[in-house]
């Protein structure tokens, strides 16, 4: 099935994580097959399917295809992955490639690789997506077969972006990008073993540290609409950090562990407000509430 659907910057496409039901069923009888999570996308385009009476097969307004390649047993030290997850669209209109041309649709995601020690670590990946995902390379099957998972559409290019000793770390988070597509933000450990925010270009290259806090980040990150700040929870408080200045600002006083904010800190569309969750203790019971910070 599909999970965690996200609109593209132009509001036309949708990305999501995907597990193939046929492969999941096959894995119960074939030990060589595993139920692997991957990334897929939907584009506008009517789809008609036969009605089999189960109410499981329905006509639709969007066409879907898998856009990340996963494999059961990634070879150590390679770019092969056995899980693609926690993705985000790159930029509001894609990103500019090193040659100056524009890739109009692309997704950044976390991919689980095996390092030289055969340990699983997550790295940043990018998949470039063509304007039409209804076509497949010769010999391929977009829908998959009874024994193979769906193939990628023709023109999809998957690339590994980061090559780090320990990979992505920290609380679960979806990769975020600036609206111009120039930066992908993710979390990893710094030299002091503290979870910080880092950035990298979708074209690859050097990784830059964004936050320099004395404590680890506690939840997902989000970028302000003007691309100036990243918001997150840390030290039981709401924080923002300048992406270019690296200056961090505590926006709420430090809460107790029982009443600490948690989850993602969400920007309003105009960047003038932040929304977050925090527990309030009433009669010794915790109740999750929504809070707003307004400029």
Language-model features and meaning:
Residues 1-295:
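Sequence signature of WD/YWTD-type beta-propeller architectures
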């Amino acid at each position: 099935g599909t999970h965690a659907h996200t609109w593209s910057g132009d509001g036309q496409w949708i990305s999501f994580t995907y597990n193939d039901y046929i492969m999941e069923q096959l894995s119960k009888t074939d030990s060589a097959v595993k139920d692997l999570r991957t990334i897929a996308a939907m584009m506008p385009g009517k789809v008609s399917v036969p009605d089999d009476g189960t109410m499981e097969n329905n006509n639709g307004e969007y066409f879907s295809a898998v856009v990340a390649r996963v494999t059961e047993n990634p070879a150590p030290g390679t770019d092969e992955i056995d899980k693609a997850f926690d993705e985000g669209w790159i930029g509001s209109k894609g990103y500019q490639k090193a040659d100056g041309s524009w890739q109009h649709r692309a997704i950044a995601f976390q991919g689980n690789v095996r390092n030289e020690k055969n340990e699983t670590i997550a790295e940043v990946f990018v998949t470039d997506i063509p304007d039409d995902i209804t076509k497949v390379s010769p010999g391929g099957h977009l829908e998959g077969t009874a024994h193979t998972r769906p193939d990628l559409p023709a023109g999809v290019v998957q690339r590994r972006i980061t090559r780090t000793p320990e990979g992505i770390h920290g609380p679960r988070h979806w990769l975020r990008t600036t609206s111009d597509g120039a930066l992908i933000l993710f979390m990893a450990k710094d030299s002091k073993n503290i979870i910080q925010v880092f950035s990298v270009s979708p074209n690859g290259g050097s990784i830059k540290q964004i936050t320099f806090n004395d404590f680890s980040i506690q939840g997902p990150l989000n970028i302000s609409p003007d691309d100036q700040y990243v918001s997150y929870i840390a030290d039981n408080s709401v924080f923002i950090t300048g992406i270019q200045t690296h200056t961090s600002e505590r926006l709420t006083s430090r809460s107790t562990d029982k009443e600490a904010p948690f989850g993602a800190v969400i920007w309003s569309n105009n960047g003038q407000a932040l929304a977050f969750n925090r527990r309030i203790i009433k009669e010794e019971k915790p109740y999750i509430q929504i809070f707003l910070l307004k400029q």
